[in-house]
Amino acid sequence: MTRHLFALSLLGLSFALNPSFAAAQETLRPLAEALLDVQADAGALETRIETERFAALKSLPENTPIRMTGLNAKWRLPFVIARDELATKASVTFKWTPSPVLLPVKSQLNLRLNGELERSLPITTEEIGRTVVTTVELNPKRLKDLNELEFEFVGSYEHNCESPADASLWLEIDRESTLTLSKQKIRVANELQLLPSPFLDPGARSRLTLPVLFPVRPSDKTLQAAAVLASWAGKTADWRDLSLPVHYGEAPAEGHFVVFATPETLPEFLRGTAEITGPEVRIADAPHSDWAKVLVIAGRNDEELVEAAQALALEGDRFAGPRVLVTEPPRLPPRPAYDARKWLPTDRKVRFDELVDHPSQLRSRGTFPDPIAVHFRLAPDLFVLPRTSIPMELSYRYTPPGEDAKASVRVRINDALMGYEVLESDESATAPVVRRVAALDAMAGFLRALSLPTVHLDAANTLEFDFQYDVAVTDSSLPGKCPSASLTENQVEIDPASTLDFRGFYHYAELPNLRLFTLSGYPYSRFADLAQTTVVLPKNPEAQDVSTMLAAVGRIGSQTGTAGVLVTVSTDPSPEESVLISVGGSV
């Protein structure tokens, strides 16, 4: 057999990730009071002050201010508060510049938090045309898990005749403006239904850290259980960077962590709890902390640790209560190659609704609808060059442009323009109207057979549909007549039944190729459950060796979107092993 071998250096395992927060965001449930432990002395908890730049909270173009106009008068800033955090104070400090032609007082800037008005700032004579720095205190009682801060520009430049399309109506906000939150950690209840919270925050935009504790030096089977958990953590972390520091013997000083334990290795802080009667997952209070939790992967022996970790990786979203006993080993049928959840299938046409988390991601609305983005990944060894294009059947619906107005749709693949179509009015539409949803009966619909140029394809791809509407401004030369602009609420939608067709391509890659491994975990990710992968560690591995191994396996899980529940770990590999990952100079 051919052996594929990569050695991971302890000098550092670092991967560059491209966050795509615009991709579908899961709505986070607010913390229910029933899920919080009562704090005897909430004031004793340490308060941390965190300040985030607007540009860090929302992807913004470099060196470009946030610009609002009469036609595009609102801008929204999303931000997340973790489930185990309580915001006691919140404020926003922003630098802004209004147009010099605005009428004072009549023009204003409104701030809303989660739909509720926080502050209305009339633009004074002294502020017109000048850069102003303003701090607004926000009501912390309105904060939830998933929040949205909205800026609304209300501009006026004439007492009688004015048009929202006038170019002199604008207000700019500096992208370096900041949001400041004062937070306290709170202790959530011992409830597995909250997973992956509080151990991994689904709304975090930065690096995630999940320490792993081994009460004693781990066996190969215990390391295998840890690798399965790391793969689940990587799948959960998705595009975020993930760190899994390893501790031997001593629990981390603070923060949430995971521990692997049998009756013989049960750490002191868990003694006296429920007896271990089989593979199980439980949640408990962490030692030396007023708020942290510990996720316990337990079993009567090392083999049951693997079963418990596999159950968490495969069925953790169905866990409930403080403790779950695994009564039957998880069913692990063999999986075919290239069936990773994140990789586009190549044996059939793929519908667009398979590429998004929620149907709403295929819709957009507004005077100027935001582009609709569809993200998809390809197997890293998919050989697309022999063909010049990929068939795409695209059906879309849109609000027809008004009389004398123009509209178009631009289709881009990885920022490269691949198609342009003029959107015709309802009266002049030549294609049949699609009427699949009653609410969309007023929208014109078209079916187009397009092709994606293969030269622009990569392992990770973004297909963007940018619907652009022009506003028709009517200008009258008659006395007493004012120019007018029709600000229609336009709605656009990509039909979920639209398809991409990657059938007929071959898989080919020259190995070894560290770039493919870094980008997608290939060749190990070829089987997403890592059924043919063995990670080789030195005998008696150091904590850093194990941490590097967990980071590598977690990275593969993040790129496939699939937990590697069949990965094996060995400190004494047999020569028959066919696909190996070597850590710490072990081979």
Summary of predicted features, one role per range:
Residues 18-26:
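Signal peptide processing junction and immediate N-terminal pro/mature segment
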